[in-house]
Amino acid sequence: MAATPRHAMTIQGGKKGRDTMASKADRHVLYEDSVQCVEAEIDFVDDTFKKLRNRKPRLLREDFCGTANTSCEWVRRRKRNRAFGVDLDENVQQWGMKHHVAKLGEARDRITLLNENVLDVDMEPVDIVLAMNFSYWIFKERDLLRRYFRSVYEGLVDDGIFFLDAYGGSDAYKEMRERTKYDDFTYIWDQASFDPISGDMLCKIHFSFPDGSRIKNAFTYDWRLWTLPEIRELLLEAGFERVTVYWQGDDEDSDEGNGEFEPAERGEADEAWIVYISAEK
């Protein structure tokens, strides 16, 4: 969503006239360091496709690609891999071109960034389409989300697979903040508001720093909280042949997930969970 003045990014804290850690930080770098793990994500997508289709995928389309960090990881994996990143935010794509694509060497010729609407993108069919980090939750109506899923279906080769993720659990319905400390900053996930009737939710990401400065509203998301049954039903209605949910295992030494995702028919009623979903054409 476009940030309104109420939700616009602001730099806070620090003494007047002095540079702060927040003023010198890059929100995209902070996001990639705290939210993304493109290596593990591509490991899962690549391995799962090969298990399901008994071949190596080559063509990948990353919807809502942002900085195209994931697309860049894809073209680094194999010399025949190609990636297409689709996003409406041209400024973020330009950041990705400068900080990621330009550093790829020869692989930069195998990545294409499209400044287009994912609902209308028209390009060659691909093996894989990705919609990660819950980005598709921007579509709040069933008909619109089904339309998006159908456009993905039509954009895949005959044995193509659509990969997406989702989160839930009792904490997902709460207005709450969760802080995660890193070496030189703290990531703050802010579920600012939730409407249980419509499912509308407003989520934000903030970053704070040891010098007391802060980036408020570094990122803002105006979403609908979709449930797994709804997502599965809409994928099947859009034409996909089989939909599989991959549940994350538990780390024996902590209450956190272990990063290993396996196919599951039933899940645990945890306070918070994240899953991958595959939808096979």
Question: Where would I find each of the regions flagged by the language model?
Answer:
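Conserved class I S-adenosyl-L-methionine
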Residues: K56-G66
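Conserved SAM-binding loop of SAM-dependent methyltransferases across substrates and taxa
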Residues: T67-R80
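Conserved SAM-binding loop
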Residues: G96-M97
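Conserved SAM-binding strand-loop segment of SAM-dependent methyltransferases
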Residues: L104-V118
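A short acidic, Gly/Pro-enriched loop at the edge of an enzyme's catalytic core
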Residues: L119-V129
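A short glycine-rich, Lys/Arg-flanked "PGG" loop and its adjoining helix->strand segment in the class I
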Residues: L144-D158
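SAM-dependent methyltransferase
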Residues: F163-L234
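C-terminal lobe and adjacent flexible extensions of AdoMet/dcAdoMet transferase-like proteins
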Residues: L225-K281
